[in-house]
Amino acid sequence: MKWLCSVGVAVSLAMQPALAENLFGNHPLTPEARDAFVTDLLKKMTVDEKIGQLRLISVGPDNPKEAIREMIKDGQVGAIFNTVTRQDIRQMQDQVMALSRLKIPLFFAYDVVHGQRTVFPISLGLASSFNLDAVRTVGRVSAYEAADDGLNMTWAPMVDVSRDPRWGRASEGFGEDTYLTSIMGETMVKAMQGKSPADRYSVMTSVKHFAAYGAVEGGKEYNTVDMSSQRLFNDYMPPYKAGLDAGSGAVMVALNSLNGTPATSDSWLLKDVLRDEWGFKGITVSDHGAIKELIKHGTAADPEDAVRVALKAGVDMSMADEYYSKYLPGLIKSGKVTMAELDDATRHVLNVKYDMGLFNDPYSHLGPKESDPADTNAESRLHRKEAREVARESVVLLKNRLETLPLKKSGTIAVVGPLADSQRDVMGSWSAAGVANQSVTVLAGIQNAVGDGAKILYAKGANITNDKGIVDFLNLYEEAVKIDPRSPQAMIDEAVQAAKQADVVVAVVGESQGMAHEASSRTNITIPQSQRDLITALKATGKPLVLVLMNGRPLALVKEDQQADAILETWFAGTEGGNAIADVLFGDYNPSGKLPISFPRSVGQIPVYYSHLNTGRPYNPEKPNKYTSRYFDEANGPLYPFGYGLSYTTFTVSDVTLSSPTMQRDGKVTASVKVTNTGKREGATVIQMYLQDVTASMSRPVKQLKGFEKITLKPGESKTVSFPIDIEALKFWNQQMKYDAEPGKFNVFIGVDSARVKQGSFELL
């Protein structure tokens, strides 16, 4: 073993040398060797030990360390989550080696969604980069830091397609588009797992939440999902499959019901599709407490029935409840659950432990004890350079009237807003083991950028919200939002006074991190009224007004778009967020981000997404007609469309040229455009290619993203960007649930966003 110097392992191996000799060694990490090893190990296990492997518990008040020690001794734990230090992880693994009969190692997991100790932009921000190299950076750094903490698995990436910004977990995914989410998720899986999850600085991923969790009705957390098979497989399933095809070792099962059946009890989903059709060999993990929730769903009569239904459906590991350990022994004894079913689930768990290399070295992600950091949160453990680079790419310039931006590093700048100096909020939700006092706020970033060159005036200006009900909700478990006791008017007056003295006002506004999180669905997606009042007062000063948005979902910004001279969408930018945002504000970095999700004008437009189907009476603003698909009290399209984002320079895109007007089924057509930087600054933009199946056996979207390329051009420079199109890009699930491409005309759209495109067409023969 690699780190045999661990005292716990040495003692345990000395006590039972024969068993240890068989269990641990230099096992080949091949499917054949794994299957033989696990088959042999299963023969040595008791029923209780097999059940114990299916139990995933959280360290916390419900499971103090003393209680966990006894569970480990009795072989009643398979994995642990929510502990993130080498010291704690080593102690529990030592207990396995010293106290348990078979010494089957634990694996340790955590929600490493957009960073571990270094916090990167939230996934919605990362998607805004449209840069797979940025995704790889986040994945590799996150895996390195997680593995360096002793972790073996992350509950990520989240690849739920979301087209409803009311849903709080929209922040955790990659947006509204199937293709973008698929390729981002696939890239993240490969980056985090590296060549093998057994590698010292790699971790196993768990694609989540299977399936269609992002389509919950009304954007309400944990709600039901009901949709056709065609929509499910065309729009929502591809990202999961892409992540699994990339090699993800685990799947987290969604909390929602799908077409009337909770995913946790859906054997069609977990066996017929996941195992049989897709060939998945890893583990399925329930979401937190999901098995007991089957009773409230109404698909299980009691706890025992819930366990029976879940295991038979294909849920291998039970997260954060005691139901499997409590009720499976009786179900096995009665024959309601067979030994073969139990063995299948246990085999899946042991398989991933083998793939993690834990049977070669249970301490593979820990290293020798003497290498443990004296300070877990040491500054030296952070990757600030990478965090800043990725955060800059996540910023989207939404508006820039009269070239308000970039700002000068001179004069007087008023920095206001409740989020301007919040170290906690800039990290966003699911910020893993990130420490708030290590993050850079927007105020600090601006101060760092200007040094002594400009005078900075700061005023909070408003609370996040003055709605007591919302504040109480956000502070239910801790004081996440601190409320200034001053009157709203006094705070606004202070900010206005600062603005009047300044040459320009930078207002940092939006949501707190807790407003864009699990269980944080909103019916109103405007900026809270307290901040809207502040913006209105700042506008009245007549000073140039720059809005820096900090949020985890699209916001309805019609009024703010009218008031502001410039708007930056920065999402929750992470540990280096303030420095990265300042880089963009002052022109040290030219923004290149693009929106991965459409911004509605109002909540009444939802869902608004670019890849919708046409109706028989589509709205055409150039030909007004009362009887068309539109709202009569609101403009028809989004405020900002998918793929939208400005730059400090300008670009032109030529007409589309095609290599051929026709395409054979086994051939390709290449679509090309010439892109020119027509401005005065070097800049990057994302050239996006969309396809439309004009006439098919069922209605097809008006356009679908099928390719993109991020390019950087100097002033006056041009580049030809080409996209090869093959048969796979044209396929869809038809009415007969056959995945195929149909002959006929296809339109090709290429441009800088989903609305501003040039068009060509070809025919599939």
What are these model-derived regions, one by one?
Residues 1-19:
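Gram-negative bacterial Sec-dependent N-terminal signal peptides
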Residues 20-734, 740-754, 763-765:
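Glycoside hydrolase catalytic-domain context in secreted enzymes
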